[in-house]
């Protein structure tokens, strides 16, 4: 299935039904009085997170989603039926934003989480509500309110604890396949990875974390070079970034330091907050460097790169150094997970408008119009 991580849709909630202006007309009941019922409420549009869906491809082609209108009220105190709701199933990790106002509507981070996207209009009042001691036969009634109409932007940001950064062919896919059960495509040409891959790394019976591999970046990605830098959105939820560097490039004219600096520059162009995220340097392909040259090459790289953060030397192909790196990652995440989760919850509390969402009366398949 084609991986789609962005879509734009229009959601239209149902209009409320009009109230009825009716009088009771019945044999042997003179002056029966008003009996016009209220209109039904318009249907709502909900989004629900579903872990069985992993792409937004359904919403790339079905762009308009409508809930049903409420029925009009009728005589004999008959109230109109409420419009059926529409439920849109989306992948866990989907962020929903109002394109007109920029408001963050929802951040679907848990399976089954349900959020209202558009609220149906209230039904109008029938004339029985306007009866009084001075107006025994009112003919007033109110019309139903229109439902909300919104243009929404959907963005899928995968849920991972660790993100991999690096140039094409830096060994990211080889690394994730060596430490997890993920089976990404691996080849000796650039841009083998075309979509994010997730792998679960287990360091104990009940100790694990999720790692995300995204397509490689090159210098100028912010201007559209290579595959661009839009895949960096999938690293925004991570707790730590691993910057993989090919320490033994096949082309002798390639400078690993220049490539590493280019990656950092692209990261900063995309998002300052992502640039400030904890980042570890992972020097890969040490098995390709002669043992007597390794220490000098590593020292030269660190000096020219001007790096004073955590450094790990590994070979993703042979597994050298990978186990120690995974244990260090788990220990770091365990130590900082509470603070990371608290920060995310604080952001949601201030930026996301969650509305109470009762169980939907009706639903629609992903991408289906009501």
UniProtKB/Swiss-Prot annotation:
Domain OBG-type G: 160-334
Annotated binding of GTP, by residue: 166-173, 191-195, 213-216, 284-287, 315-317
Region Disordered: start-end pairs: 344-370
A Pfam family annotated for this UniProt entry: GTP1_OBG
InterPro entries: G_OBG, GTP-bd, GTP-bd_Obg/CgtA, GTP1-OBG_CS, GTP1_OBG_dom, GTP1_OBG_dom_sf, OBG_GTPase, P-loop_NTPase
KW Lyase (keyword) present: no
Assembly description: Monomer.
Function: An essential GTPase which binds GTP, GDP and possibly (p)ppGpp with moderate affinity, with high nucleotide exchange rates and a fairly low GTP hydrolysis rate. Plays a role in control of the cell cycle, stress response, ribosome biogenesis and in those bacteria that undergo differentiation, in morphogenesis control.
Stated name of the protein: GTPase Obg
Species annotation: Burkholderia ambifaria (strain MC40-6)
